[in-house]
Amino acid sequence: LGPGGDPLPAAFFGRPADRVARDLLGADLVVRGRDGGIRRLSLVEVEAYLGAHDLACHGRTGPTKRNATMFGPAGVWYVYLCYGIHWMLNIVTGDVGQPAAVLVRGVAEIVGPGRVTKGLEIDGGFDGRPATPETGLWIAKPAGGVRWPLPARWIERTPRIGVDYAGLWAAKPLRFVVDAGRLPRMDRAGVDPFGLARPTQPVRRR
């Protein structure tokens, strides 16, 4: 395998968003930079948005120009601008026509969805692109001997952040977080090929 690792196939994402979200923890978000260098960081915090019945989901009111990508095939990036400032990175899940996705909220060393996209130079240009090495942004199986999917005892489930408007759905435990100290650290230049990485600090709660 190259430094970007073994990409997850589209079929991995063609499942309910909550199942995909849980299994994404510990996998690697991989970005090819403008200089051609590879950055690879473990996913440590995600949120699931289950579809039109989920009152916190962008697709609850039907397709629009902004959310059209959510109604397409699984394994495609859905990237939108929040408050006119921060790009939010999501991966589409489930069946075509059923708007569901997983929001990337944190990777090892970078916590907060806006910080992730800023730190990795991800913007709206990735919206609608498949999560493959050919597009320069993908998710790979973890390197460094990480046990994956992660054991349930490593994962905390909580309500999602910033969805108080969603009624009963605001309390659903659809945010998934893992202690980043259990995962190998990927340095800023790329992957640690020998699995000798130092542990990160635990994920900060907000």
Each model region followed by its residue ranges:
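Conserved, well-structured core segments that form or line functional sites
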Residues: 1-206
